[in-house]
């Protein structure tokens, strides 16, 4: 072991010695290179100095010659050693003089003399400059100005004509050469690519908005034309036409079956449509999303499915989703983020879900806990999660007192309530029901209509007084009735219509205002604080088509109606009608008290007449 360690130590010492030798050699090499570079620099500097001295000498000679002074070559005696000077003899001096004379004869005679030096100073040339400004008419020098302008204008480079010629030649060649023609396969590949479809859909929507925008550039902010518009302002107190939505392909020959405004984007309106019997090859069910913000005449989104869409709604808390209930019983879900027009989700056609037409779909709950509620005409109510439509979370059949199931045609939830709701049926009866609890299912029955219920809606305006127990219904019996959940008899019957009343809805902001539409194409607004016998405002749609659906905007300032010919009409509601005053809730309370008193008197009179 000791021998190996000694050997290793010896190797280490040799390695260190070799490293020292290499470093010493490297250091010497660097010093040698440094010396060489220094010498080169010194030589270059000396050459430069010599050249500078020679230049200065030539300049001095030239200056003297210009002054008339001749320069003689200086006599440079031969170098003599000190020893030769000290040991020189006369003979040697003579011989040296003769030798010098010979040299002098070669270089020219030497003339010595005295001269007076005249010093001459040449002052530099004085340049006097000054500026002077005067005001003079410029008409006296038109030619000079033109010349100056010509001088200032930069002439075109001579290369430009050649460039133009080459450009023209290139253009001619390009025009003569036919462009590369894409094959049909390449065209179809581009047209069906995901990037092109996304770009085309997005770009056409923007271009449509820009082309359809109309701005009144003659608007007068001074108010001078207010007198001319006084009649229009008075008419605006009632109803005025705002927009009409109709698509030649997707709306024609279809019936508007449902309307709903988006809560996230108030300008968006979804409308569902029945099948088009004139076009059997088109999809049976269609849902169109219309935009009120832009003046475009085409729908923002087009969705369709295989079965007629009987109901549609924007999925609350999910602004990209649209829910539809179909005639086949399926619940379909469309997503506007997808490039497909067909549903991204749908419920199965099985006994676990709906097998009859779904006329009612509604999203209830809060941001963190909400469900989709659907009811079909076989009386089955289902609760769904929007994330999974493969099977319902909960289902129940609405049956009244062990009789047959209730054929539901309409449904409404009170404001802020997710458990209790009211439904209208094909038999003409109205029912209250609840989803959960010991009394889940049908609670009470309300009788009063003589025909199927077409529309039902709970009181929606929130204010100082709670009127959530009120609801209105419309029916085929040409009437609209006012109800309260506290009494199974109608509070009041509005009988001003002369045709089927297809839909009814409370104003979302005014406590005493509701709207209804009938089969004669008439839209009525009822303000119960003003009158209960005749509507406050009425308007008929052009052509008098049957109006199937009515829907207020969330602001209560516009109202949409859909007809049997596929057209949607938007009306502006006058401020005097739409905007409630502060005392409207108290006035409506007094109106209800009067209605209750009149109903009690009528019941007493009827009771006294029966025995007689």
Swiss-Prot record:
Result when mutating residue 51 to A:
Abolished both phosphorylation and pyrophosphorylation
Task: Kindly give the Gene3D superfamilies that the UniProt entry links to this protein.
Answer: YVTN repeat-like/Quinoprotein amine dehydrogenase
Q: Which residues carry this modification: Phosphothreonine?
A: 89
Phosphoserine: modified positions = 51, 84, 91, 95, 98
What are the entry keywords? Acetylation, Cytoplasm, Cytoskeleton, Dynein, Microtubule, Motor protein, Phosphoprotein, Repeat, Transport, WD repeat
Query: From its record, what is one biological process in GO terms?
Result: microtubule-based movement
What ranges does the record list as Low complexity composition bias?
82-91
GO cellular component annotations, sorted alphabetically?
A: cytoplasmic dynein complex; dynein complex; microtubule; outer dynein arm; vesicle
Entries under InterPro entries matching the protein = DYNC1I1/DYNC1I2 (IPR025956), Dynein_IC (IPR050687), WD40/YVTN_repeat-like_dom_sf (IPR015943), WD40_repeat_dom_sf (IPR036322), WD40_rpt (IPR001680)
WD repeat locations: 251-300, 304-344, 353-394, 403-443, 448-493, 496-536, 542-581
Coiled coil regions in record: none
SUPFAM superfamilies referenced in this protein's UniProt entry, alphabetically? WD40 repeat-like
Q: Does the keyword ATP-binding apply?
A: no
Which residues, renumbered to this chain, carry the PTM N-acetylserine?
Answer: 2
PTM sites of type Diphosphoserine: 51
Q: Where in the cell is it found?
A: Cytoplasm, Cytoskeleton; Cytoplasm
Q: By its UniProt entry, which Pfam families does this protein fall under?
A: Dynein_IC2, WD40
Chain segments annotated as transmembrane:
none
Post-translationally, this protein is described as follows, namely: The phosphorylation status of Ser-84 appears to be involved in dynactin-dependent target binding.
What function does the entry list?
Acts as one of several non-catalytic accessory components of the cytoplasmic dynein 1 complex that are thought to be involved in linking dynein to cargos and to adapter proteins that regulate dynein function. Cytoplasmic dynein 1 acts as a motor for the intracellular retrograde motility of vesicles and organelles along microtubules. The intermediate chains mediate the binding of dynein to dynactin via its 150 kDa component (p150-glued) DCTN1. Involved in membrane-transport, such as Golgi apparatus, late endosomes and lysosomes.
Describe the protein's quaternary organization and the partners it interacts with. Homodimer. The cytoplasmic dynein 1 complex consists of two catalytic heavy chains (HCs) and a number of non-catalytic subunits presented by intermediate chains (ICs), light intermediate chains (LICs) and light chains (LCs); the composition seems to vary in respect to the IC, LIC and LC composition. The heavy chain homodimer serves as a scaffold for the probable homodimeric assembly of the respective non-catalytic subunits. The ICs and LICs bind directly to the HC dimer and the LCs assemble on the IC dimer. Interacts with DYNLT3. Interacts with DYNLT1.
By sequence similarity, the record places it as follows: Belongs to the dynein intermediate chain family.
Entry protein name: Cytoplasmic dynein 1 intermediate chain 2
- The organism encoding this protein is Mus musculus
What are the top taxonomic ranks of the organism? Eukaryota, Metazoa, Chordata, Craniata, Vertebrata
Q: Which gene encodes it?
A: Dync1i2
């Amino acid at each position: 072991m000791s021998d190996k360690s000694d050997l290793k130590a010896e190797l280490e010492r040799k390695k260190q010695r070799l490293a020292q030798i290499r470093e010493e050699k490297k250091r010497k090499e660097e010093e040698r290179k440094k010396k060489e570079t220094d010498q080169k620099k010194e030589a270059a500097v000396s050459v430069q100095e010599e050249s500078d001295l020679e230049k200065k000498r030539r300049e001095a000679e030239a200056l003297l010659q210009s002054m008339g002074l001749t320069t003689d070559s200086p006599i440079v005696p031969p170098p003599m050693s000190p020893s030769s000077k000290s040991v020189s003899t006369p003979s040697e001096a003579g011989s040296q003089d003769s030798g010098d004379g010979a040299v002098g004869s070669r270089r020219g005679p030497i003339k010595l003399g005295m001269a007076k030096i005249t010093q001459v100073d040449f002052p530099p040339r004085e340049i006097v400059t000054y500026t002077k400004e005067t005001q003079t008419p410029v008409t006296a020098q038109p030619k000079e100005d033109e010349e100056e302008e010509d001088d200032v204008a930069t002439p075109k480079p001579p290369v430009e004509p050649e460039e133009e010629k080459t450009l023209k030649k290139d253009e001619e060649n390009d025009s003569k050469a036919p462009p590369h023609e894409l094959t049909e396969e390449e065209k179809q590949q581009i047209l069906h690519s995901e990037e092109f479809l996304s770009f085309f859909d997005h770009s056409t929507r923007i271009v449509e908005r820009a082309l359809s925008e109309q701005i009144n550039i003659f608007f007068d902010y001074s108010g001078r034309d207010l007198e001319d518009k006084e009649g229009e302002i008075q008419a605006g107190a009632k109803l005025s036409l705002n927009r009409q939505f109709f698509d030649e392909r997707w709306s024609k020959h279809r019936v508007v079956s449902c309307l709903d405004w988006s809560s996230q984007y108030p300008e968006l309106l979804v409308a569902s449509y029945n099948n088009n019997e004139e076009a059997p090859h088109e999809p049976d069910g269609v849902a169109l999303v219309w935009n009120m913000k832009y003046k475009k005449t085409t729908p923002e989104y087009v969705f369709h499915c295989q079965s007629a869409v009987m109901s549609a709604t924007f999925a609350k808390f999910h602004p990209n989703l649209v829910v539809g209930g179909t005639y086949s019983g399926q619940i379909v879900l469309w997503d506007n983020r997808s490039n497909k027009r067909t549903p991204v989700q749908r419920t199965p056609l099985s006994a676990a879900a709906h097998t009859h037409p779904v006329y009612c779909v509604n999203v209830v709950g809060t941001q963190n806990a909400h469900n989709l509620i659907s009811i079909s005409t076989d009386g089955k109510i289902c609760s769904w999660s929007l994330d999974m439509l493969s099977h319902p979370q909960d289902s129940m059949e609405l049956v009244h007192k062990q009789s047959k199931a209730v054929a539901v045609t309409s449904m409404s939830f009170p404001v802020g309530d997710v458990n209790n709701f009211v439904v209208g049926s094909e038999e003409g009866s109205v029912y209250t029901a609840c989803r959960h609890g010991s009394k889940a299912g049908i609670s009470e029955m309300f009788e009063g209509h003589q025909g199927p219920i077409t529309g039902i809606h709970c009181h929606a305006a929130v204010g100082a007084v709670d009127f959530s127990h009120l609801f209105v219904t419309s029916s085929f019996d040409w009437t609209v009735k006012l109800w309260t959940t506290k009494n199974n008899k109608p509070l009041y019957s509005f009988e001003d219509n002369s045709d089927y009343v297809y839909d009814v809805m409370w104003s979302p902001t005014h406590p005493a205002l509701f709207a209804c539409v009938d089969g004669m194409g008439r839209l009525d607004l009822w303000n119960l604080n003003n009158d209960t016998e005749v509507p406050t405002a009425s308007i008929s749609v052009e052509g008098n088509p049957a109006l199937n659906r009515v829907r207020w905007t969330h602001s209560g300032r516009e109202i949409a109606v859909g007809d049997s010919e596929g057209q949607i009409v938007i009306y502006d509601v006058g401020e005097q009608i739409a905007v409630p005053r502060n005392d409207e809730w108290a006035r409506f309370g007094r109106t209800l008290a009067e209605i209750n008193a009149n109903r009690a008197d009528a019941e007493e009179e009827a009771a006294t007449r029966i025995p007689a």
